[in-house]
Curated annotation (Swiss-Prot):
PANTHER family xrefs: CYTOKININ RIBOSIDE 5'-MONOPHOSPHATE PHOSPHORIBOHYDROLASE, LYSINE DECARBOXYLASE-LIKE PROTEIN
InterPro entries, sorted: CHP00725, LDcluster4, LOG_family_nucleotidases
Entry's Gene Ontology cellular component terms: cytosol
Residue ranges crossing the lipid bilayer per the database entry: none
Organism domain of life: Archaea
Protein name, per record: Uncharacterized protein AF_1126
Family matches, as Pfam families: LDcluster4
Amino acid sequence: MKLMQIGVIGAGECDEETYRIAYRVGELIAEKGHVLINGGLGGVMEASAKGAKSKGGLVVAILPRKKDLCNDFADIRIATDMGHARNVIIVHSSDALISVGGGYGTISEIAIALKEGKRVASLKPPVVIEGMRVFETPEEAVNYCISSSVK
């Protein structure tokens, strides 16, 4: 099995249900031995990173500003000082992406990923865009991403 870098994208603030879903996505990515990449802030990013760490996973945070803004669950912190432009780095660093909820930033990441031909699985999508796949469970979303070929 080839190691994958799976991006988990979503809003920096979220409700409890979205947090639980993102946490489970992080757990599953780690359990399957893959690397989780995200934006390093709160909400979906924190939840997915925390879930991955609970299962011994590796988390890479691509931060919009400085390293000290990162949540406590990233192993590798990449400070870009690029604001939302860092979304492009998250997408290009990921072999496949899973969106959990989200807003405009998440929509931009989904669009860039689809433009680049990457698989995008979505749970509670902010919008549905042609080419992305919507799933009901974290297990389905993670399995879909893992079944993709590494680019």
